[in-house]
Amino acid sequence: MKEMPKPNKYLNSRFIARFTMVGLIFCLIISQHMLAQPNTTAGVRRWKVNGTMREAMIYVPLSAKTKPTPVTFLFHGHGGNMQDMFHDHTFEKLWPEAIIVVPQGLMTPGTLVDREGNRSGWQQSLGDQQDRDLHFFDTILGSLEKECVVDKSRIYVTGHSNGAKFVYLLWANRADALAAVAASAAADTQLLAQLKPKPVMQIIGRGDRLVKPAWQLRMVRSFRQLNQCSSPGQPFANLATMYSSAVGSPMVVYVHPGGHVYPATADALVISFFKGIKKE
């Protein structure tokens, strides 16, 4: 009967050494991956507001549980959605220390397009849609204030088109909660009489065929008068001008060569503007 071959101690030791080395490398990769994870939580949150389920994409730095944290709301335009708005603008990368909220609108009749209300959007005036979106804003902010340490002197809102008109509505009806606002591709002269001085940024596309640049420049002139802004302004960034204010409410006007869009080139400017404003 043949003897079984004796195990090769040298080969066994080499196998064990290699196996151990692979294990160590794997553990190192995993630990580095875990260390590289941002100290944040992000995802979709839901609330029931007056019987209707509402949702938003929210980015929350973990430091918000212990440190006063600014909050920025970003509202999509008519027919838009929270996913595209969140991923296209990546405010959380530009301001990782802030809470970023991108709510989802509901089916809403538009003023310039979609009069039937087959696409998502926001209420246009006080009392419209039973003020569902004003209540939604209040609910989100209230829940964040319960769960996080919100810096109430640094709450900001920005939006595009119909979402920017809703920003104007928030300015008119939630002014005491807001430090500053930024509107892209919007105009609503009917709300002007309801506004109090507030730091504001207006983003205008020279090629906007839906909300005419002339309409938006009319808003700019009204905002400058409301905020008692100086003339002429000073450069804020490329294509952007800042106007100082006698009442502490400066204005920035960014005129880009594009059309009816919230351009990615505006993102850093909006965040820079917001970072420089704190409500007294």
List where the protein language model places each region.
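Acidic catalytic loop of the alpha/beta-hydrolase fold
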Residues: 207-211, 260-261
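Bacterial N-terminal signal peptides
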Residues: 20-31
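Short substrate-entry loop that stabilizes the transition state in hydrolases
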Residues: 64-112, 209-213
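Short beta-strand/loop motif that positions the catalytic acidic residue
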Residues: 202-204
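Cap/lid segment of the alpha/beta-hydrolase catalytic domain
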Residues: 104-132
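Alpha/beta-hydrolase fold nucleophile elbow
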Residues: 150-160
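A domain-start/cap signature at the N-terminus of enzymes
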Residues: 32-71, 83-84, 89-90, 98, ...
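Alpha/beta-hydrolase active-site loop
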Residues: 125-148
